[in-house]
Amino acid sequence: MSAENINELKKWVAELARQGSGEDFVGLNRVVDIVSKNFGVQPHEVAIMTITPDDRFLRFLFPSMLREVGQIPLTSTNALAARTVREKRPEVINHFAVVPHSSVFEAVPIAEDTRADAIQKIMSAPIAVDRKICGVIQVSRKGKSAGEAGPDFTHQQLRELKAIGDALAPCLALSPVAK
């Protein structure tokens, strides 16, 4: 991620934290725009989740259409996001379509009449404050095939995503959902 984009991201996150709510979705939308442009994906291919107050589930903050669909149990053995929390480490999977995983969230339409393609490639990184995981950020590439989805994610991009997660942490820690 360019220094300019990182600085812009930090500015938006600082503003969200000042406002005292990680659920300022206008601000969060701007963060997602910056992240999606950096990785060359569509905004709906960026997911930001926060851990619920009882430390049992992950709840989507973005994409907005997944907020009310459901939550991911942290005990789930098939959810990459839950594994990211449990193992406290980022991960990249460039063959995600063939990895057993829960696809319930992939079935949610991205627009009223538009179904999303399957996730082919994905990066997942924990969001932590003082070493306590408070959420997960994921960036995916969707398509009918891995080739159609675009280039593989690199380990450098995974490091960038981890840095983005670190930058988002102050805002997510203040989210009413995370308290």
What does each of the following model-derived ranges do?
Residues 15-19, 29-41, 49, 83, ...:
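Amphipathic alpha-helical regulatory segments at dimerization interfaces
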Residues 1-26, 174-179:
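Signal-transmission linkers at sensory-effector interfaces
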Residues 120-129:
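A short, aliphatic-rich beta-strand micro-motif
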Residues 135-179:
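Juxtadomain coupling helices with adjacent low-complexity linkers
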Residues 59-61, 66-106, 113-115:
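Regulatory sensory and allosteric helical modules in signal-transduction proteins
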Residues 33-36, 46-72:
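GAF sensory/regulatory domain recognition
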